[in-house]
C-alpha cells in the first residue's frame, strides 16, 4: 500500500475507517464545492456480503479486499456493517495532470487520448 499512496501529489484527505456490527454510512452524495476531486476507496478486509454491504447508485456493489476503486461519489452511496473489525481506506485526490496520469496508468483498459 505504501507504493500506492506515494504516487499522488495532491491529497484532499486520506483516512482509515473502522466499522463494527450495526454501524453504517447512510446513503449520501459527496459534493465538491471548491476543488474537483476523485474518490478512491480501498476495502482492506471483510467484503463478503454477509459481513458488509456497499450500496452504489441503488445497487449492491461487490468489492475485493485490498483493491483500490475509483468511485463517482456524486452518485448515491453508503455502507452497512454486519460484523466487527471492518477496515477501509478513503482517499480524496485533487484532479490535476499528475494525478490524472496516475489514474490512467493504474486502469488496465484505459487508452491515452492526446
PLM regions: where:
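Conserved metal-binding segment of the jelly-roll/cupin
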Residues: 61-76
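A short hydrophobic beta-strand segment most commonly corresponding to one strand
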Residues: 38-44, 68-70, 84-101
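Active-site or metal-binding loop neighborhoods of secreted/extracellular toxin and effector enzymes
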Residues: 99-113
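Signature of the catalytic double-stranded beta-helix
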Residues: 1-23
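A short secondary-structure junction signal
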Residues: 26-30, 50-57, 81, 101-102
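A short beta-strand-loop-beta hairpin characteristic of the jelly-roll/cupin
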Residues: 43-64
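Asparagine-centered strand-capping/turn motif at beta-strand->loop junctions
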Residues: 77-83
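A short beta-loop-beta micro-motif enriched in histidine and acidic residues
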Residues: 10, 26-39
Amino acid at each position: 500500500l505504501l507504493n500506492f499512496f506515494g504516487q499522488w501529489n495532491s491529497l484532499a484527505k486520506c483516512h482509515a475507517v473502522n466499522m463494527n456490527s450495526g454501524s453504517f454510512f447512510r446513503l449520501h452524495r459527496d459534493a465538491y464545492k471548491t476543488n474537483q476531486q476523485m474518490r478512491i476507496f480501498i476495502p482492506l478486509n471483510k467484503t463478503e456480503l454477509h459481513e458488509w454491504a456497499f450500496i452504489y447508485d441503488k445497487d449492491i456493489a461487490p468489492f475485493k479486499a485490498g483493491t483500490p476503486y475509483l468511485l463517482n461519489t456524486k452518485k448515491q452511496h453508503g455502507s452497512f456493517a454486519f460484523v466487527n473489525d471492518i477496515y477501509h481506506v478513503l482517499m480524496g485526490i485533487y484532479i490535476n495532470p499528475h494525478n490524472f496520469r496516475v489514474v490512467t496508468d493504474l486502469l488496465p483498459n484505459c487508452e491515452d487520448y492526446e
